[in-house]
């Protein structure tokens, strides 16, 4: 019997070091940007890349990611075309082969429209490593997410500052490899972590998560620069940067310039 290949996210987390995760919306800011940007992020040292699944009504996202999603849709991104981009990235078609773990993050509506089981099988076939679906709570999605796990996909759940200790422990037990902590209760990109009282509150919250979580956890929302990354590394196992990356590449006139800006920004975080 052929031994099942280890999930790339699982393997990455076994390296036992602090992680830097990139969030990128495909085909932003211009069509054709995805593969060059993925290559630039990989070369720049991204440990895991979260690819956004664009949706027309992303209620949990701030204006930067909402705008990026609308541009992605305008540039023809669908669930099917996104999976094809992942397949090309893994095969090295149009770029150097992308080996960094890839996590898809998006709302449930496009996945339901695609067909839940079909999506899971096609995602695995394309080379996706994991899923984070913010509007699909574990209480309402046990069967779907169990099927995802059975196919070897990492399933990531959210923890927020208002999550009680007993639920932190439960979410931690459900997450395959790690949980995703929202730094504050806000839409993406709108959080401000520089205020001393806010920073102290976030610190206490992450210390509480550390007390109740047995698995690793990363933190996102409002992380914009190297100083914030280093601060979060002291409290969590990884930091996620998304809105600031999208802001840095916004307005690039072509895929090459988008990739150059992405690489420049990401190297500055490292």
UniProtKB/Swiss-Prot annotation:
One of its GO terms (molecular function) is tryptophan synthase activity. CDD domains: Tryptophan_synthase_alpha. The active site is at residues 50, 61. It catalyses: (1S,2R)-1-C-(indol-3-yl)glycerol 3-phosphate + L-serine = D-glyceraldehyde 3-phosphate + L-tryptophan + H2O. Keywords: Amino-acid biosynthesis, Aromatic amino acid biosynthesis, Lyase, Tryptophan biosynthesis. It comes from the Bacteria. Pathway: Amino-acid biosynthesis; L-tryptophan biosynthesis; L-tryptophan from chorismate: step 5/5. GO terms for cellular component: cytosol. Its EC number is 4.2.1.20. Tetramer of two alpha and two beta chains. The alpha subunit is responsible for the aldol cleavage of indoleglycerol phosphate to indole and glyceraldehyde 3-phosphate. Belongs to the TrpA family. This is Tryptophan synthase alpha chain. It comes from Chlorobium luteolum (strain DSM 273 / BCRC 81028 / 2530). The lineage of its organism: Bacteria, Pseudomonadati, Chlorobiota, Chlorobiia, Chlorobiales.
């Amino acid at each position: 019997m052929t031994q099942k290949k280890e999930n790339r996210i699982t393997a990455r987390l076994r390296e036992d070091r602090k992680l830097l995760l990139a969030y990128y919306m495909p085909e932003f800011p211009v069509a054709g940007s995805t593969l060059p940007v993925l290559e630039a992020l990989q070369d720049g040292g991204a440990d895991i890349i979260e690819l956004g699944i664009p949706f027309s009504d992303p209620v949990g996202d701030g204006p930067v990611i909402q705008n990026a999603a609308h541009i992605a849709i305008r540039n023809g991104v669908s669930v099917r075309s996104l999976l094809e981009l992942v397949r090309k990235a893994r095969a090295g078609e149009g770029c150097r082969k992308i080996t960094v773990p890839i996590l898809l993050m998006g709302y449930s509506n496009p996945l339901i429209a695609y067909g839940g089981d079909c999506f899971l099988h096609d995602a695995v076939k394309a080379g996706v490593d994991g899923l984070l679906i913010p509007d699909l709570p574990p209480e309402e999605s046990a069967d779907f997410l169990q099927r995802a796990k059975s196919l070897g996909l990492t399933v990531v759940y959210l923890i927020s500052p208002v999550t009680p200790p007993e639920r932190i422990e439960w979410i931690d037990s459900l997450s395959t490899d790690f949980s995703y902590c929202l730094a504050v209760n806000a839409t993406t990109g709108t959080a401000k972590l520089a205020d001393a009282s806010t920073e102290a509150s976030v610190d206490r919250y992450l210390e509480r998560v550390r007390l109740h979580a047995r698995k690793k956890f990363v933190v996102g929302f409002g992380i914009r620069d190297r100083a914030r990354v280093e601060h979060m590394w002291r409290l969590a196992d990884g930091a996620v940067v998304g809105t600031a990356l999208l802001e840095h590449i916004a307005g690039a006139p072509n895929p090459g310039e988008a990739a150059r800006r992405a690489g420049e920004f990401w190297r500055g975080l490292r």
